[in-house]
């Protein structure tokens, strides 16, 4: 069992989140087609700094993530510093925790703030599913290395003669778990079957997500936290997410065929999050530094937790594992929360985690706890929709959720919010936020 671990520095400062921003999220190969993640990252960080009017030298560290990495820019964080006019002496490094990458980036900046090595930093993430590192076969890669070391033309030709046509085919990024060979959708199908989640339930959650996201845009709730993106060569712009289907009906969802288990499956493209391009970032400071600069924080980070489970069966249970730990460290219960925002990788995964958060048996047998974490109140859950509607640029989603939840907490007069996500590799993340 854990204990209450308040995120307060030795000087008594809380960890303040002073602002957050994201690009609109775009479906793969649409508005951001051809724009690499590093450029999306520069776009959002540059605009975040401009809007905040915080002097660049105030930011002492930038931690950024990218899940689908480009070989030519392996440290996306440093490229963002150099490409946005920030102080060249700003510390910058990159992290990856699959779909929880920007949660990790935030945690790393928080650790620096808690240690006292910095007083302000930026955390975030960017991903592009439209600009991908296309590789070569292992055999071709080995031959190319050997050719580079060959001394004569005859040696080079002999090496190339070993290749067959199939060896020359490009190799796209893997979509399956390295350790198991399972795709994320295969795991979602596992979870639907394990926990008895029907196709109708999944479609209903997906429909709810789109309806609520569309309403959030219609009500103007997202305008402040989503920038307008001007797309090179700057003849077009994108001001809103382009995946949201506000006019869809449940009948539309029912028309789609299963995408993974073709014969007996229930997971479809419509009740899953789509491949997406986008970037998001937040500025964090110690509470006293924010006061010195005359800034009113969006809110504060009260606690966080990361967990890991086995990858072979139902591995997308991160929220069910990490949430009780984050709540315990915050000294709170589910009943104390004003809002709950859970990453919707798949409707099946989301519904399974909701089910297990309220399960006494899961708490006892899996978590070793005496009582269930708590039932999820639908009136508090993903009130503005979730990733199924907005999309999911892997490394950007956590920062989107944090910013979105804090803004909504402030609209409701303050309170506590939980943001939580599953991630590839059986990983989970949860953070408890506070707004006044």
From Swiss-Prot:
Localisation: Cytoplasm
GO terms of molecular function: acetyl-CoA C-acyltransferase activity
Listed name of the protein: 3-ketoacyl-CoA thiolase
Pfam families assigned: Thiolase_C, Thiolase_N
Gene3D superfamilies in alphabetical order: 3.40.47.10
SUPFAM superfamilies, sorted: Thiolase-like
Assembly and interaction partners: Heterotetramer of two alpha chains (FadJ) and two beta chains (FadI).
Residues forming the catalytic site: 99, 392, 422
Similarity field: Belongs to the thiolase-like superfamily. Thiolase family.
Organism: Escherichia coli O157:H7
GO cellular component: cytosol
Pathway named in the protein's UniProt entry: Lipid metabolism; fatty acid beta-oxidation
């Amino acid at each position: 069992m854990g204990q209450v671990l308040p995120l307060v520095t030795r000087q008594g400062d809380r960890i303040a989140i002073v602002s957050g921003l994201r690009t609109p999220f775009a479906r793969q190969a649409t508005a951001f087609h051809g724009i690499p993640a590093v450029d999306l990252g520069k776009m959002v960080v540059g605009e975040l700094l401009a809007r905040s009017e915080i002097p660049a030298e105030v930011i002492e560290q930038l931690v950024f993530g990218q899940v689908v990495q480009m070989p030519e820019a392996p440290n996306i964080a440093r490229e963002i510093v150099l490409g946005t006019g920030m102080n060249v002496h700003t510390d910058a490094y990159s992290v990856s925790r699959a779909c929880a990458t920007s949660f990790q980036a935030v945690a790393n900046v928080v650790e620096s703030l808690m240690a006292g090595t910095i007083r302000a930093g930026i955390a975030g993430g960017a991903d592009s599913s439209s600009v991908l590192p296309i590789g070569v076969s292992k055999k071709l890669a080995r031959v190319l290395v050997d050719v580079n070391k060959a001394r004569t033309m005859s040696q080079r030709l002999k090496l190339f003669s070993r290749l067959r046509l199939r060896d020359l085919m490009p190799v796209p990024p893997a979509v399956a778990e390295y350790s198991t060979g399972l795709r994320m959708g295969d795991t979602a199908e596992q979870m639907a079957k394990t926990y008895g989640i029907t196709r109708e339930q999944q479609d209903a959650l997906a429909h709810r997500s789109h309806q609520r996201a569309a309403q959030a845009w219609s009500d103007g709730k997202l305008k402040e936290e989503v920038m307008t993106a001007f797309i090179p060569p700057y003849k077009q712009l994108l001001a809103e997410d382009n995946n949201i289907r506000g006019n869809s009906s449940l009948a539309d969802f029912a028309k789609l065929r299963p995408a993974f288990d073709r014969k007996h499956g229930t997971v479809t493209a419509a009740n899953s999050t789509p491949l997406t391009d986008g970037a998001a970032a937040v500025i964090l400071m110690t509470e006293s530094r924010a006061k010195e600069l005359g800034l009113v924080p969006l809110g504060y980070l009260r606690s966080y937790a990361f967990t890991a489970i086995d990858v072979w069966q139902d591995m997308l249970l991160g929220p069910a594992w990490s949430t009780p730990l984050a709540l315990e460290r915050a000294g709170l219960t589910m009943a104390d929360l004003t809002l709950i925002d859970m990453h919707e990788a798949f409707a099946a995964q989301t519904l399974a985690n909701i089910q297990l958060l309220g399960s006494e048996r899961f708490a006892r047998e899996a978590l070793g706890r005496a009582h269930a974490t708590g039932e999820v109140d639908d009136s508090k859950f993903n009130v503005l929709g979730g990733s199924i509607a907005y999309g999911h640029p892997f490394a950007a989603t956590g920062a989107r959720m944090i910013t979105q939840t804090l803004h909504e907490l402030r609209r409701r007069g303050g309170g506590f919010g939980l943001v939580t996500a599953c991630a590839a590799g059986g990983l989970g993340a949860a953070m408890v936020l506070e707004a006044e």
